[in-house]
Design a protein with these regions (language model features):
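Beta1/beta-strand and adjacent pyrophosphate-binding region of the FAD-binding site
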Residues: 2-15, 33
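Glycine-rich FAD pyrophosphate-binding loop
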Residues: 24-45
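N-terminal FAD cofactor-binding segment of flavoenzymes
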Residues: 42-87
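Helix-loop-beta segment of a Rossmann-like dinucleotide-binding subdomain
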Residues: 89-108, 146, 250-254
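Short beta-strand to alpha-helix junction loop
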Residues: 98-119, 257-262
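Predominantly flavin-linked oxidoreductase catalytic cores and closely associated redox partners
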Residues: 120-278, 335
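FAD/FMN-dependent oxidoreductases across multiple families
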Residues: 231-233, 239-241, 255-374
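C-terminal helical "tail/cap" subdomain of flavin- and related membrane-associated enzymes
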Residues: 341-511
Length: 511
């Protein structure tokens, strides 16, 4: 059997289905085929959105009804720090919102979301083969692509004017074209699972046993994306619709090694329970069997995002780090930029310049994002004072730039990638600078035994961030705190130089 399609999308989850839906809706006459290998989607990792990704889901894909009925509204980002595993959870330093967040974000059962987006694509006329496996792929340029597909016991061959790779980390096209690149300077691994019977952080047990801990926070801690912070690692607790909780750990291989244990689920739980808040949340929790996953060397990218007759979207284009939940941001940018460029092409326009510009800007964005936010960040993740500075600056810059851009002129702002213009490049330079300095200060603190000294008895409750210039006040606060840190660091260095032997204590690095 052989058929001809204008567009073949390999991968039917959110990245592939979104791009197919947008193109088919814009050009109803296109023949669009989606090839999905699974009979039903699983609950994959990537369960928390940030504000940019949420804007894409609500204002571009118009999924507000699904998100309101089938998913959980996220109660912000919350971080917990500790010094010793015997500390009380009530003493853990905390960073998070004082009250409910002002812009929507969500905690997602990905299997439900992926199915909802795929159904939207089918309703506008896309064709679906499922379960189906791509057996061979020939990329011969626009109009000369061929895909061999196994559907049940039948082998089908299709020709495609364009092929979109939405296969996630499998990255079929980048690997085939030798464009797949591991990001070796960011060697992070992850383990995650779903648990039942986690402690309700807003429940009566907390209010009765620790009213002084519960009372000051007006927001719901339980529905936040809760982060357990440590030296070289961080863990997440994400509540899902129906009562299950996604629990995960991300760590830098250079700084942390997962302790041994009978199985991955027990190793994950055992380690996170060394954190007092993890111990409180997971003390009675039960790991759901056959729902434990691990992945090494998370960070990677494709050296090219679009070529002659092909494009990569979502995680197939690259992935940096789960911290700050920005995976959906990259899905949004790659899907919408690809949609706009291919929409022009299907309308008969020349896209050579826009394709070249997109390839250049994506690489610039990816590497700027890495160098500005994630490079060597795992050195200071476990120090509350350093992460307070980073929180003000990282989140402030995010709301001034990407969030403000998404909400100011949606949806076309998704094809204008952040950090591409002069202002974005200026912010990128500032962010690279403070990120590198915070990592350097952390290394000095580790060496002299002062790492994490402010990890107890501190609460930083922030008002909600809003897009655009209003978030400059958070940036200014962050810059002031950064400069204070630099002064403190210089004074400590001078004292150490003046009095040899001072600062040679055993390093304090929470494990």
């Amino acid at each position: 059997m052989q058929s001809a399609y204008d567009l073949v999308v390999i991968g039917g989850a959110i990245a592939g289905a979104s791009t197919a839906f947008l193109l088919k809706r814009q050009h109803p006459s296109l023949r669009v085929l989606i090839i999905e290998k699974t009979e039903e989607f699983d609950r994959k990792v990537g369960e928390s959105t940030s504000e940019v990704g949420a804007c894409f889901l609500t204002r571009v894909l118009n999924l507000s009804n699904h998100l309101g009925h089938e998913q959980i509204t996220k109660s912000g980002l919350r971080m917990w720090f500790y010094r010793d595993s015997h500390d009380s959870y009530t003493r853990c330093a905390e960073i998070g919102p004082k009250h409910q967040t002002r812009l929507p974000a969500f905690q997602l059962d990905r299997s439900k979301l992926d199915e909802a987006v795929l159904n939207k694509a089918l309703r506008v006329g896309c064709e679906l083969w499922r379960p189906a496996k791509v057996m061979d792929l020939e990329l011969g340029g626009e109009g000369n692509n061929r895909v061999d597909v196994r559907v049940n016991e039948e082998t089908r061959t299709v020709s495609a004017r364009w092929v979109i790779d939405a296969t996630g980390r499998n990255a079929v096209v980048p690997r085939k074209l030798k464009l797949f690149r591991p990001l070796e300077t960011h060697p992070i691994n992850a383990i995650w699972a779903r648990f039942r019977k986690t402690t309700d952080l807003d429940g009566p047990e907390i209010w009765e046993s620790a009213p002084g801990f519960a009372e000051p926070c007006w927001a719901m801690r339980q529905w936040a994306t809760n982060h357990l912070m440590g030296y070289g690692w961080w863990g997440w607790l994400i509540q899902l619709k129906g009562g299950d909780c996604s629990v995960g750990l991300v760590y830098d291989q250079r700084l942390f090694e997962l302790p041994p244990g009978p199985n991955l689920g027990e190793r994950l739980k055992s380690h996170l329970m060394t954190h007092p808040m993890g111990k409180k949340a997971l003390c009675d929790a039960e790991c759901i069997e056959k729902d434990v996953h691990a992945r090494s060397n998370l960070a990677y990218y494709s050296a090219q995002s679009m070529g002659d007759g092909w494009a990569v979207v979502g995680d197939a284009a690259g992935f940096l780090d789960p911290l700050y939940s920005q995976g959906f941001d990259f899905i949004s940018y790659t899907c919408y930029a690809t949609f706009e460029i291919l929409s022009d092409r299907f309308a008969g326009k020349d896209i050579s310049q826009s394709r070249a510009r997109y390839n250049e800007l994506y690489q610039k964005q990816f590497h700027t994002w890495f160098e500005s936010i994630y490079q060597d960040k795992y050195y200071y993740l476990g120090d509350a004072e350093l992460m307070t500075v980073a929180f003000y600056l990282d989140i402030g810059a995010y709301f001034i730039g990407p969030v403000g851009q998404a909400y100011s002129n949606h949806p076309h702002r998704y094809s204008e990638l952040p950090y591409g213009g002069p202002i974005g490049q200026l912010f990128g330079k500032l962010m690279r600078c403070y990120n590198a300095r915070l990592a350097a200060i952390a290394k000095r603190r580790i060496a002299n035994g002062t790492y994490g000294l402010h990890n107890l008895d501190s609460r930083l409750f922030l008002p909600g961030f809003i897009p655009g210039p209003a978030s400059f006040k958070f940036m200014l606060t962050g810059i002031r705190k950064w400069l204070e840190l630099e002064c403190k660091n210089q004074l400590q260095r001078r004292r150490s130089d003046a009095l040899p032997g001072i600062g040679q204590a055993t390093p304090l690095a929470p494990s």
